Structures are given as structure tokens and as C-alpha cells.
A protein has these predicted regions:
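Compact nucleic-acid interaction/catalytic patches
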Residues: 15-56
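C-terminal terminal-subdomain/extension
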Residues: 58-107
Length: 107
């Protein structure tokens, strides 16, 4: 398990798993039981991304377009992540970092 990988995540009460991007530092991912993730939509993206979202798709290893929500971090146990789905491409990593900063008012 590594930063920028996309895994399936299904919290209690959610009807289906969602793609989730690991955004914790590599040291945390390697050594701690909890990681930060950004959750994506579970359905195919059929609209433009909102200012706090980034589109992920086949270039990131997914089978369809999805929207990653960059304005809300989820702290999850690593053992609740299953089914590795892909890796965020280098360009999308830059987009996600910029969107996290912008949507949280950090820049």
C-alpha cells in the first residue's frame, strides 16, 4: 500500500464501495494503521468537475471516469481498504494537490 494508490473503501452504511485515493505521507502509509484518503464518486462522472473536484479515469487505472472530492479528508484504517484499483497519474497528482490547497483556502 502506497500514497497515491486508489483502493476501494466502503464505510458502514454506504451501499457500495467507492474509489479512495491515499494521500498520506509515505512514512505514515508504511508505518501506521490509519491513512488519509480522498473519496471519489462511485458512479461514472457525467458532469464537469466542481471547483473542489478532480476527474480521474483510465489514465489512473480506473475503468471509468470518477470525481475525487478534494475538500474532505477521511481518516481510515488501512485494513478497511480493499481491491487496489489503480495509481493516480503524475499530472493528476499535481491537480489534486492544487485543488486540495485551493478548496481548503490554503493558497
Amino acid at each position: 500500500m502506497n500514497a497515491w494508490e486508489i483502493w476501494s473503501y466502503q464505510p458502514a452504511g454506504w451501499p457500495e464501495p467507492h474509489p479512495a485515493v491515499i494521500v498520506s505521507a509515505p512514512n505514515r502509509v508504511a508505518n501506521k494503521p490509519d491513512v488519509n484518503v480522498l473519496v471519489c464518486t462511485s458512479k461514472t462522472a457525467n458532469r464537469q468537475a466542481l471547483p473542489f473536484e478532480v476527474v480521474l479515469d483510465e489514465a489512473d487505472g480506473l475503468d471509468r471516469q470518477t470525481l475525487v472530492k478534494c475538500d474532505l479528508f477521511h481518516l481510515v484504517k488501512k485494513d478497511t481498504l480493499s481491491n487496489r484499483r489503480g495509481d493516480v497519474s503524475t499530472e493528476r497528482r499535481r491537480q489534486i494537490i492544487a485543488t486540495i490547497n485551493r478548496s481548503n483556502g490554503w493558497v
